[in-house]
């Protein structure tokens, strides 16, 4: 069954924050020649194919959400804006704490059942706890790729 809501974590899933988490970067952030850097020249970038996946989901009328436990939610939102991808996300749950809380709020806001959601994250603990809700969870090791996301969108 095709999911009605695809949810992504941010760090190590949608983007690479110079090999760390976005809340370990050093603002202010700036764009230089189309690339995003923090004040220490650490670069943040989307994983290859991320825009393609977001465009495909949008084209298929599948809602997209974020579930991130970052300690600096405003930095994450600023980076989403600088990357020009924030417009793709209908739902944003970006704050510290358990991903269980993120998904309860996603369910309440969307009106969808957990079984209608799919979640991509790089941390096994998040995959374990969210899957207990009934959400289909996929562990990604080094960021999402179009091939991985597509394979779960079409699997029955």
Predicted feature residues:
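Short, acidic loop-to-helix structural element flanking the phosphoryl-transfer center
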Residues: 35-65, 74-77, 97-101
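Surface-exposed amphipathic alpha-helices with a cationic face
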Residues: 54-59, 107, 127, 131
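Metal-dependent phosphoesterase signature
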Residues: 16-48
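Conserved Rossmann-like nucleotide-cofactor binding loop
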Residues: 13, 20, 72, 125, ...
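Substrate-recognition "cap/lid" segment bordering the active-site pocket of phosphatases
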Residues: 67-118
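Asp-based phosphoryl-transfer active-site loop
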Residues: 2-19
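Acidic, Mg2+-coordinating phosphoryl-transfer loop and its flanking beta/alpha structural elements
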Residues: 114-155
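Short beta->alpha linker loops
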Residues: 49, 70-71, 97-98, 122, ...
């Amino acid at each position: 069954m095709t999911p009605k809501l695809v949810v992504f974590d941010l760090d190590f899933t949608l983007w690479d924050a110079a090999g760390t988490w976005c809340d370990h970067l050093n603002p202010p952030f700036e764009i230089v020649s189309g690339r995003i850097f923090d004040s220490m020249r650490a670069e943040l970038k989307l994983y290859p194919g991320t825009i393609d996946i977001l465009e495909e989901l949008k084209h298929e009328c599948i809602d997209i959400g974020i579930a991130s436990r970052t300690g600096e939610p405003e930095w994450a939102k600023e980076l989403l804006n600088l990357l020009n991808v924030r417009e793709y996300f209908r739902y944003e749950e970006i704050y510290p704490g358990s991903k269980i809380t993120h998904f309860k709020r996603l369910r309440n806001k969307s009106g969808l059942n957990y079984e209608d959601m799919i979640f991509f994250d790089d941390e096994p603990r998040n995959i374990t706890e969210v899957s207990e809700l009934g959400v289909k969870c996929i562990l990604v090791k080094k960021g999402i790729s179009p091939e991985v996301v597509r394979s779960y969108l079409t699997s029955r």
